Amino acid sequence: TDDDIPMNEGCLKPITIILPDDCMLQAQYPAAVIAGNVETSQIVTDTLYGALGVMAAAQGTMNNFIYGNDTHQYYETLCGGSGAGPDFDGCDAVHTHMTNSRLTDPEVLEWRYPVLLESFEIRDGSGGAGKYRGGHGVRRRTRFLEPMEAVILANHRIVPPYGMAGGDDGAVGRNWV
């Protein structure tokens, strides 16, 4: 294909996906559908890119991190690595697919909320190795300065993001309390 064509309506032509009734993408009551748009969309996008040979799996999750107490509440999505492609490395520490958002600047986060961002760094070695390397994820350590409840909704904690064209899988994510 010619990758140098200008953006036009043909580039945005939708595809039709035919699904069986009562599957993960067409859940029927009383199936649990929490985070149906956030986490499922990441898996669907990675699956489509993989099937088309466009790129290996990205972090495959929005890493939805929610915490708070009666006074303060905060919700953020944490970045990770993007998948490598047939002729390019993945990017480190980026939001991918549906996430497409920015993190709050650490100074603003600490000013607005009773938290201390102790570290935020690239997790070296977490991107899948290969001729073209998958992007590395991150390590983020947050200290609560007041009692808080916290929840993380994330994928790829057991099954790693898949590699492509002989490349290794990426590392699974980890959550520590």
Model-derived features: where do they sit?
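Glycine/proline-enriched, intrinsically flexible loops and inter-domain linkers
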Residues: 1-177
